[in-house]
From Swiss-Prot:
Protein name: UPF0026 protein MJ1312
Domain of life: Archaea
Entries under SUPFAM superfamilies matching the protein: Radical SAM enzymes (SSF102114)
Classification via CDD domains: Radical_SAM
Cofactor details (free text): Binds 1 [4Fe-4S] cluster. The cluster is coordinated with 3 cysteines and an exchangeable S-adenosyl-L-methionine.
Cofactor(s) in the UniProt record: [4Fe-4S] cluster
Family, as annotated: Belongs to the UPF0026 family.
GO MF terms held by the record: 4 iron, 4 sulfur cluster binding; catalytic activity; metal ion binding
Organism of derivation: Methanocaldococcus jannaschii (strain ATCC 43067 / DSM 2661 / JAL-1 / JCM 10045 / NBRC 100440)
Amino acid sequence: MTIAFGPVPSRRLGKSLGINSIPCKFCSYDCVYCQVGRTINKTIERREFYSPEDIFKSVEERIGKLNNEKIDYLTFVADGEPTLDINLSKEVEMLRDFDIPIAIITNSSLIWREDVRNDILNFDLVSFKVDSVDEKIWREINRPHKDLVLDKILEGMIAFRDNYKGELITETMILGSIKYTEESIIKTAEFLKELNPNKCYLNTPIRPPSEKYIKPPKIEVITKILAIFNEIIGKNKIKLLGKFEGNEFIFSENVEEDILAITSVHPMREEVIKELLNKSNISFDIINKMVNEGKLIKLEYDGKVFYMKNIKSRDKNVSNP
């Protein structure tokens, strides 16, 4: 498979060249809103998935095709949880050759482990998932591996922050199907205040989630959570993410390969694909062909059409592990 993809426009990281370092779908969580689909292999065991040399080569080849296109970050964002990769530290060391800042987007679930904390200290930017610090809501949203303990994860985040010199951000997903109590919102905000990241991002689902019952929250729910976060953490630290990143995706000469690499982790809206293909003077027929060949699937969410690589985690027959 293609490990490096993009760059893709990111609402947090600018132009991000993605590194899909975990196959579909090894993860410690099975989040109800995950755009990659349901977790097939729920695990907390770290191991090698790809060799560091293969990851380096894939990034090197991808950068070589971009004609000096600006890249803001090399970002470990995968079909699963990137800290499951036991070679993270070596990979970051090798990727320093490109002189581009390196980021990781993690669900935070393994941060209680000292080896994981040490491995990600060398990233320029670390993004932690903190959907809720309320035990019941955490289990309902993130559906964690049976051996994970929320308190240990939260303690691990604080321990990491005490030693980290880079930029730390957090992301909190707000869902329409969750009954947030004021107490649960306050608890999460108070934890984030203690964690003291550079920025706390609030997000809502904008792409097809793994579970069809997941809907965007009502505006009054967003407003309430935003008000509590602003009061406890401070307005300067909080940012509510907008609807979509934009359409500044980068294609190489192999458009089909690029579409499959991007949509493996990042479902693309139909209108964005059409615009990108038009810029490259390529007919939309290529998308219809990929759907007919079973390479892509067509999804609908919140009144919009998306296309995604046909991966096993999106199979409706996949059950929760």
